[in-house]
Amino acid sequence: MWYQGESDTSEAEGKVYLALLKKLIGLWRKDLRNENLPFIVVQICDLNNRADEGWRAIQCCQAKAETEIPQVKTVTSRDVCSHESIHPNDKRALALKTARAYFALTERAAEK
């Protein structure tokens, strides 16, 4: 699971984020000797409706990861945060969403 903030990002970093995320996932899968290792990306919620370009670019890349990298699911935390804090008030709800994403990946892999 990758659960990383975006508060210190720039638009330039957003342009390379997806490529770096692909590389990171690939390296972890190689190191763990499992090319199909399920990987969950958790998007941090919007902080006070923050909408700067760097933040949005990272969130966009995180959403694309699900379609561009095999065995990856993206989970958003927007619906479990208050928008006054990037940390969810209901951590259990986010944990359940993450678990569902993981099981969706592992069930799909088992069907192949």
Named regions from a protein language model:
Residues 1-112:
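Cell-envelope and extracellular/periplasmic
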